[in-house]
Regions:
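Exposed boundary/loop context
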Residues: 12-13, 52
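Hydrophobic transmembrane signal anchors and adjacent membrane-proximal interface regions, especially
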Residues: 10-12, 32
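Bacterial N-terminal signal peptides that target proteins for export
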Residues: 1-8
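Scaffold/interface architecture of coatomer-like assemblies
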Residues: 19-321
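N-terminal signal peptide c-region/cleavage motif recognized by signal peptidases
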Residues: 15-17
C-alpha cells in the first residue's frame, strides 16, 4: 500500500493536491475516505477493488473510487498534549514520542507545533521544521492545573493549522484522557471547524479509570426507533460526551488508541502505524451536498466477515454568496 514514511501522508488526506481548491467549500465536493479492512483476527486485507465497497452519504449510495497514488505533500502537524489533571504522570510513558512523530511524518517537508493544555491551551512551540526544537518543547512540558479542556485545545490547534500555507495538509496528534473537563467551546462549533479546515485528528489516550470506562459504554446498545433516526450532529454530540478523544478521531478519519504504560504506548503506536499505511483511500463526489454534517458509512456487502474502519462524516459548508 504505502511505505512507512508515507504513513502520515495517507492520514492527512483532506486537502486537494497543492491546495488547488477547498474540497469542502467547493460546490463540487470531493470527499476522501481512509478505510482500513481487517479480518476477524486483525490482519489487514488487500486486493479489494472499488466495486467491492459501498459508500453512503446520509444514507444515499455514492459511486466509490479508489485513490491509487497519494503524493508526498508537505505536512502541518499540531501535537496537542494534555498536562492538566493526572496527565502529567503519564510523561514517562511518552519517551518515544519524538521518534514516533519523525517516523510518522517521514521524508517530506513538515511544520510541527506543540500545544499543551489543562483548563486552557498554550502554544509551547510554534510551527517549525526543526526536529530539535520540537524535541526541546516536549521536554519542557510542566504539570498543569485541574482541567482537561480537550475541545478547547483541538479548536485552538485547528485555528493554528488554518493559518499554515494552503499546500500543507493538516493534522492534530492528540494525547489526552478520554473525557473533556472544562471546555468552553461547543461540540458543534469544534466539529464544524475541524471539518471546514480539513483537519484529521489522531488520538492516543490514557486508559480511563474504571468509573470512566463503565460510563463510556452506557447507551452504546440503545434500541428502538430513536437509535437510528438521530441526525448525524446529534449522534456526534452523544459520541463526544461518551469519549471525546475517540469521537473526534473517528469523525475526521483518524484513529483512536489507548495505553497505560510505556510498553503499551510503543505497542499501540506500532499497531497504529501499521494500520495507517495499510489503509485504502476511497473517494466520492456528492452533487451539491446540503450544508452541515454528513454521515458516511462504508460497507463490503460481499465480504460481511471482514471488519471495516472508515471515516464517519464530513462537513459541507454553504456555498459562498
Amino acid at each position: 500500500m504505502r511505505l512507512l514514511q508515507r504513513s502520515l501522508a495517507i492520514l492527512l488526506f483532506f486537502t486537494t493536491a497543492a491546495g488547488a481548491q477547498d474540497v469542502i467549500r467547493a460546490r463540487s465536493t470531493l470527499v476522501l475516505v481512509p478505510t482500513l479492512v481487517e479480518t476477524k483476527k486483525g490482519e489487514p486485507v488487500f486486493a479489494l477493488k472499488p466495486e467491492d465497497f459501498v459508500i453512503t452519504d446520509n444514507g444515499v449510495i455514492q459511486p466509490a473510487r479508489l485513490e491509487e497514488d497519494t503524493d508526498l505533500e508537505p505536512l502541518a502537524l499540531a501535537v496537542v498534549i494534555q498536562t492538566g489533571r493526572e496527565a502529567f504522570a503519564q510523561t514517562n510513558n511518552l519517551r518515544g514520542l519524538n521518534t514516533m512523530i519523525d517516523s510518522l511524518i517521514g521524508d517530506v517537508d513538515r511544520s510541527v507545533a506543540v500545544v499543551a493544555f489543562d483548563s486552557q491551551p498554550q502554544l509551547i512551540q510554534d510551527f517549525t521544521g526543526k526536529a530539535l526544537d520540537v524535541s526541546d518543547a516536549l521536554k519542557s512540558l510542566q504539570a498543569g492545573d485541574g482541567g482537561a479542556a480537550i475541545l478547547d485545545a483541538v479548536k485552538y490547534a485547528t485555528h493554528l493549522l488554518s493559518q499554515q500555507p494552503k499546500e500543507y495538509r493538516r493534522a492534530v496528534l492528540l494525547i489526552s484522557e478520554t473525557r473533556d473537563h472544562g471546555s468552553h467551546a461547543a461540540i458543534q462549533e469544534v466539529v464544524q471547524q475541524v471539518g471546514e479546515t480539513n483537519t484529521v485528528v489522531y488520538s492516543v489516550a490514557f486508559s480511563p479509570s474504571k468509573t470512566e470506562l463503565k460510563d463510556s459504554f452506557r447507551g452504546n446498545n440503545a434500541t428502538g426507533p430513536s437509535a437510528n433516526l438521530l441526525s448525524p450532529i446529534l449522534m456526534t454530540i452523544q459520541a463526544f460526551r461518551r469519549n471525546t478523544s475517540a469521537a473526534i478521531a473517528h469523525l475526521t478519519g483518524g484513529e483512536y488508541v489507548r495505553f497505560d504504560s510505556q510498553f503499551g504506548f510503543d505497542q499501540q503506536i506500532g499497531n497504529l502505524t501499521n494500520h495507517v499505511h495499510n489503509r485504502y483511500i476511497l473517494s466520492f463526489q456528492p452533487p451539491s451536498p446540503a450544508p452541515g454534517l454528513h454521515g458516511i458509512r462504508v460497507q463490503l456487502p460481499a465480504h460481511s466477515n471482514l471488519r471495516v474502519i472508515a471515516r464517519q462524516s464530513y462537513w459541507a459548508s454553504a456555498p459562498p454568496d
